[in-house]
Amino acid sequence: MKHRNIIYLLLALVLAGCSSRPQDTFQGMFPDYTDITIPCNIAPLNFRIANASAITVQVKGINGEYLFRGHRGLVKFPVRKWHRMLRTETGNTLTVNVTAGENYRDSFTWTVAQDSIDKYMSYRLIEPAYEVWSGIQIEQRDVTSFRTRLLGDNRNAELCCMNCHTSNRNGTSFMHLRGSKGGTILTRNGQN
C-alpha cells in the first residue's frame, strides 16, 4: 500500500509538470527596447514583432499621447513625428503600449533623457567573423537619423585591409591602409 501511494504521488507530480508553459508576451519583439533610457535626439527605435500583421503602438507622455502603426511585423516610426515627440517629452517617462492582434499585448517605459547623444559615429563595415575581409568599408552614421556616409572603401585601394581607429574625447584619430599602397592618415581636431 505504501509503495502504491508513492507511485500515485510521483505520477501526480509528473502530470502536473506537463502543463503548458506560460509564454512571454514580448518573446517576438526585436530588438528589445523595453524599460530603457534614451537620448533626447536619438533616431527612431524601430522594431519587429515576429508573425504580426498589424501593430498598434500607443505612447503616453506627460505632454501628450502619440499613436503609431506598424505593418507586416515592422514598426517604423516617422522621423519627424518621432523627434517632435522626444522634444516635447524630454526629461519625462513615456509609457509604451504595444498591441499586435489578440495575443500580443504589453507595456513598457522609455525615459527620455535631457542629455543628447553625439551626432556621429564611425565604424568598419565588414562581414561577420572576419571571414571575407576583402570587402571593407569605413562608414559614418548620423545616430539622430539613419543617414550614412561612406568614408573609405578598400575596393578603391586594391582590396587592402583598412583599419579605422577613432578615439573619444576629440583626440587624435587615424585610419591605416595596409599593402603596397598603404599609409596612415592622422587627424587632430579636424585637421589632417
Where are these regions (language model features)?
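Sequence signature of WD/YWTD-type beta-propeller architectures
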Residues: C18-N192
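Bacterial N-terminal signal peptides
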Residues: Y8-A16
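Bacterial N-terminal signal peptides that target proteins for export
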Residues: M1-I7
